[in-house]
């Protein structure tokens, strides 16, 4: 895979055209600091895009026994991939403990979109679905790897072995162990500083 640039110069544009294996979406640019803009990517509700990405990612997960994702943006993607692969179940890691959970397994982490540490949790009843299985981790965007690493820790704590990690997009840096379909660049403007 050719390595696309992770950082582009901000040129005043309001939108960025994302192309994922020939499928295009126009994303608004959002300013997140004085010199930085990000392309806002929200796949929730975009059935056509999710189906396209699932078809592209599914072949990389065919040797996995169980798929795992975190709520909420990964759910439609993993659901579609599970259907393609004929999996009747998949694991969703929740971002908080739920009263119905029995003996939950939890990992603390700080995603890029949060201001404080949160927990990623799976119900203890999922352990038999994970134990001694080959796990494929599915995410929409991988930036800092915090969420993906938390999912991997949950899978291994439950006795599974993570054999594949896939994402629609990466942002911020290339990750050798993650199969991805495209790059979501960060846009930077050079700030002139007065002496």
What are these regions (language model features)?
Residues 71-77, 143-144:
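Gly/Ser/Thr-rich loops at beta-strand to alpha-helix junctions
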Residues 139-152:
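Acidic, divalent-metal-coordinating active-site segment for phosphoryl/phosphodiester hydrolysis
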Residues 64-71:
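Short glycine-rich phosphate-binding loop at a beta-alpha junction
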Residues 2-11, 149-195:
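PRPP-dependent phosphoribosyltransferase catalytic core
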Residues 76-85, 152:
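Short Gly/Thr/Asp-enriched flexible loops that form oxyanion-binding sites at enzyme active sites
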Residues 88-135:
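Short, glycine/charge-rich flexible loops or terminal/linker lids adjacent to PRPP-binding catalytic cores
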Residues 1-64:
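Active-site-facing substrate-recognition patch
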Residues 65, 133, 163:
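Conserved acidic residues
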